[in-house]
Amino acid sequence: MKICLVDETGAGDGALSVLAARWGLEHDENNPMALVLTTAHLELRKRDEPKLGGIFVDFVGGAMAHRRKFGGGRGEAVAKAVGIKGDYLPDVVDATAGLGRDAFVLASVGCRVRMLERNPVVAALLDDGLARGYADPEIGPWLQERLQLIHASSLTALTDITPRPQVVYLDPMFPHKQKSALVKKEMRVFQSLVGPDLDADGLLAPARQLATKRVVVKRPDYAPPLADIATPNAVVTKGHRFDIYTGTALVE
């Protein structure tokens, strides 16, 4: 994949070249999207809109730390939707990981989560965020146990993941009605890179085959159900709904 690669560390140690080789990225000086290695982290920038700033994955500080400490925890809609109750903490495959926010929330309340991300740039951002998270003395020990990244397309990987998870979580990119400033900023940068998930409808069937209990699909409130398959079961919040579908039970 072609993207503008920028090293701002001043270290001259070739770290960016190693990273590019690992994720199959090719430097393109004229690409409007830039992957930038700073002294603090790896970030994505939209070069023709510098005011939007950089997007990076941060599990340790910022919004994610606030959500972990002061958010709803088990009471969060995503936690309710995957079925967390009492001692039951399902094993989850997040098949559209994105920036890893929902996966992190589930991991922080105790679920083991395997994140799938097919876009190599997004996977590189996630991997960078995970590395910093794993190294953190406070969250590192449990994060290493509960949150991992698999760089693969969900459309192919969903058929051969083992062991099978109890829950598959899907949050396909859907064209957003622009509301909050944050959504505007992140989505403009993000959608410039990955665009909408035009093949997302194809995820529902393999997800239901893989999950032993349920599939949860996050949708904006104005979006039709995935693959136009309606379900009466959903957790509804302001602006979103989490549609719940049955999985395929394990055969003893």
From Swiss-Prot:
Catalytic function, reaction form: guanosine(1516) in 16S rRNA + S-adenosyl-L-methionine = N(2)-methylguanosine(1516) in 16S rRNA + S-adenosyl-L-homocysteine + H(+)
Major localisation: cytoplasm
Localisation: Cytoplasm
Cellular component annotations (GO), alphabetically ordered: cytoplasm
Function (record text): Specifically methylates the guanosine in position 1516 of 16S rRNA.
Residues that hold S-adenosyl-L-methionine according to the record: R101, D102, E117, R118, S153, S154, D171
Protein encoded by which gene: rsmJ
EC number: 2.1.1.242
Coiled coil: none
Origin superkingdom: Bacteria
Family listed: Belongs to the methyltransferase superfamily. RsmJ family.
Gene3D superfamilies: Vaccinia Virus protein VP39, YhiQ-like domain
Protein's recorded name: Ribosomal RNA small subunit methyltransferase J
GO molecular function, one term: rRNA (guanine-N2-)-methyltransferase activity
Pfam family, one: SAM_MT
Lineage of source species: Bacteria, Pseudomonadati, Pseudomonadota, Gammaproteobacteria, Enterobacterales
Annotated InterPro entries: 16SrRNA_methylTrfase_J, SAM-dependent_MTases_sf
UniProt keyword terms in alphabetical order: Cytoplasm, Methyltransferase, rRNA processing, S-adenosyl-L-methionine, Transferase
